[in-house]
């Protein structure tokens, strides 16, 4: 009897038993998921031949705008530099670079408002932005008269509901969260009044530049939003908004923004995502392009406003997949930011350019990059504003020795970014 029962059990577990059925069910589910995933994505046109057959060549930065036919065209960096040469030679050229950082954009927004309140905010001839910095950039470009709108966007809680999960979005779509809420939020602030104001300032020769990442070519794309705004047509308004949405679309979290264009009688498209994928921040035009006849531009000042920190406090990482991946990604982003900052500081010194930078101290108590609630962002905004008002926001990167951080008023009374030991160590480590 025992042998008969054992044989029956083995038969049940055989080719048609429960174990077999479970394996079959799992295999079917995996195949269906893979098939649906392959079919669910948005249909894409073939890549342009110059993208699919050629590796990117090292070349001077080109800045994209709209051409007279409302199609994309590029503006060479040396042309941009010539616009600014008068300001540079007069010793009044100020450049602002705003980094990415998600909800940490509240730090950058508060810093600008605080500078205005202290009467210490320069008139920036060039404003560049990446990701969260791209969303701040138009207000930084327009100046203190737009501070109320800037403050509202980061303290009112209007962004609190931007994260809407997609049903099985990570498996069947291009992102975990819906893209429409982010686009609606940005569209709410990209008004006709804002575009007209940007266009008026751009007409004076000032530059508003924002970076996205072309995921097809793997390269950053710099957009001249001032020139785009000057066209004033409806598709210019849409492109202005779409560039901002793309620059803030963290891959995997939000879907890419697909932009269509025509060339040589053919229609192509490009998928653009967060500019911070390729550029933590950028200074434009290149220092060498601004310099005239190789002469140092000692009247040029660059301000790098980092929406987040450039260092991490040591901590014991849980030996779990999620914790290890999260910590590793954060460490990589911090190192990328530090490396870019060191390169910018070194290059600035070589060309006689003054560079100052500010970042959220590593010891700041709340680090929630994707918590867009007012409860998370308002304290950061107010913190940065207070530090700016008290002249403790910026660390000066000395163009002579680059050996230590210098605070403008020499005081260490307020525990603000310029007092943070981690930032000072970075400055001392510079060659």
Regions found by a protein language model. Give the residues of each.
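C-terminal motif of bacterial Sec signal peptides marking the signal peptidase cleavage site
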Residues: 35-38
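N-terminal secretory signal peptides that target proteins for export/translocation
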Residues: 1-21
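Short, intrinsically disordered or compositionally biased N-terminal tails of bacterial proteins
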Residues: 2-3, 27, 246
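Catalytic nucleophile serine of serine hydrolases
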Residues: 102, 130-131
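Sec-dependent N-terminal signal peptides
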Residues: 21-31
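Patatin-like phospholipase
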Residues: 40-125, 141-431
């Amino acid at each position: 009897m025992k042998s008969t029962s054992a044989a029956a059990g083995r038969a049940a577990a055989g080719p048609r038993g429960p174990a077999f059925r479970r394996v079959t069910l799992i295999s079917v589910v995996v195949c269906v998921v893979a098939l649906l995933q392959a079919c669910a994505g948005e249909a894409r046109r073939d890549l342009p031949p110059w993208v699919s057959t050629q590796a990117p060549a090292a070349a001077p930065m080109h800045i994209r705008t709209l051409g007279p036919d409302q199609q994309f065209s590029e503006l060479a960096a040396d042309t941009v530099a010539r616009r600014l040469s008068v300001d540079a030679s007069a010793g009044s050229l100020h450049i602002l670079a705003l980094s990415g950082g998600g909800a940490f954009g509240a730090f950058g927004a508060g810093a600008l408002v605080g500078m205005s309140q202290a009467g210490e905010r320069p008139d920036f001839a060039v404003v560049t932005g990446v990701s969260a910095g791209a969303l701040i950039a138009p207000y930084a470009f327009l100046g203190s008269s737009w501070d109320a709108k800037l403050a509202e966007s980061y303290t009112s809680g209007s962004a609190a509901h931007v994260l809407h999960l997609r049903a099985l979005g990570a498996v069947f779509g291009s992102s975990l969260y819906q893209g429409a809420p982010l686009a609606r939020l940005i569209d709410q602030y990209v008004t006709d009044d804002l575009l007209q104001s940007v266009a008026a300032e751009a007409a004076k020769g000032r530059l508003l530049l924002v970076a996205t990442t072309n995921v097809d070519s793997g390269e950053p794309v710099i957009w001249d939003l001032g020139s785009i705004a000057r066209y004033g047509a409806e598709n210019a308004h849409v492109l202005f908004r779409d560039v901002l949405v793309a620059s803030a679309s963290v891959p995997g979290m939000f879907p890419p923004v697909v932009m269509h264009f025509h060339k040589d009688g053919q229609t192509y498209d490009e998928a653009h995502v967060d500019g911070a994928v390729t550029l933590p921040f950028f200074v434009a035009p290149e220092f060498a392009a601004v310099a005239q006849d190789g002469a140092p531009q000692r009247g040029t000042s660059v301000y790098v406003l980092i929406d987040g920190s450039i260092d991490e406090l040591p901590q014991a990482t849980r030996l779990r997949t999620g914790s290890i991946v999260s910590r590793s990604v954060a460490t990589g982003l911090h190192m990328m930011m530090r490396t870019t900052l060191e390169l910018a500081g070194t290059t600035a010194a070589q060309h006689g350019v003054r560079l100052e930078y500010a970042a959220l101290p590593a010891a700041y108590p709340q680090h929630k990059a994707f918590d867009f609630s007012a409860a998370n962002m308002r304290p950061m905004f107010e913190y940065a504003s207070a530090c700016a008002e008290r002249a403790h926001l910026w660390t000066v990167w000395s163009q002579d020795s680059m050996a230590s951080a210098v605070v403008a008023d020499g005081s260490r009374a307020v525990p603000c970014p310029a007092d943070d030991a981690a930032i000072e160590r970075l400055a001392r480590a510079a060659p």
